[in-house]
Amino acid sequence: MRIIVLGSAAGGGHPQWNCHTSASLRAWQQTDGAQRRTQASIAVSADGERWVLINASPDFRQQILATPALWPQHGLRHSPIEAVLLTSGEIDHIVGLLSMRESQRFSLHASSRVLDLLAQNPIFDAVNPHYVSRQPFALDTPLALCGLQLTPFSVPGKVPLFMESRSGGDLAGSNEETLGLTIDDGRRRMHYIPGCAAMTDALRARLQDAELVFFDGTLWRDDEMVQLGISQKTGQRMGHMSIDGPDGTIAAFAPLNVARKIFIHLNTTNPVLNTLSPEFASARASGWEVAHDGLEIAL
């Protein structure tokens, strides 16, 4: 199995367009080895020829330009991307579909909840159904795509930001709002969980002894943006576990014996983006890697 990290940042990328915090400033100036990052998405292939795109980032075109494996290979129109699978209806997971409207055939797979969100917004009709079939999947049921078995499963999360005002106060929403994926090529298996609000017993059992896990790395600490004075929202309010702390991701994964653990979906304020920071050193000492755009893994 081949995995390419197309984008590694949370919504808005790194640096976000209007962010002038110290973490973003390093990315603007590209000092101290800081890397600019696009919004989180990965591509996965069993054979290196047919690819499944996991989430369609607003930075989709930039990500394709940076990834020769996903360039057109033959004919007048072609893409190695044969399927797109969405793990949520968040803006940074769906907007890239609008850049995939040029009469190219692929299949689009999502929960019924997310497909309903797309259907409610006529702008997504630009993704012509004559070329792009929208196919709902069932949770915990393997889906065969391009030589891979992809199994979507529910994790704690929340409704998309643009749906909060219509949620009636129930920000958690349905069990189809926020999903993880188990991806299996018949030999090796990985898990992709770009958003998760809490570790549950079911998730703990699923990830025990895993070979590879990409996991929500949005914030280092729950009140990170509050302490910086740029927002009143905590990580929990946004539907994300934080990396540090007694209820954080590092602590939750400590007993799970995961061979390779990689943080993805990193907010522009997160100090682990600075490879010279004590937070980055702490994450690495705990056995974690920090994803970057262009990271490739052969599993």
From Swiss-Prot:
InterPro entries in alphabetical order: Metallo-B-lactamas, PQQ_synth_PqqB, RibonucZ/Hydroxyglut_hydro
A Pfam family of this chain: Lactamase_B_2
Alphabetized UniProt keyword annotations: PQQ biosynthesis, Transport
CDD domains with a match to the protein in the record: PQQB-like_MBL-fold (cd16274)
Disulphide bridges: none
Pathway noted in the entry: Cofactor biosynthesis; pyrroloquinoline quinone biosynthesis
SUPFAM superfamilies (alphabetical): Metallo-hydrolase/oxidoreductase (SSF56281)
Biological-process GO terms, alphabetical: pyrroloquinoline quinone biosynthetic process
Protein family per UniProt: Belongs to the PqqB family.
Function of the protein: May be involved in the transport of PQQ or its precursor to the periplasm.
Name of the protein in question: Coenzyme PQQ synthesis protein B
Source organism: Xanthomonas axonopodis pv. citri (strain 306)
Lineage of origin: Bacteria, Pseudomonadati, Pseudomonadota, Gammaproteobacteria, Lysobacterales
Name of the gene: pqqB
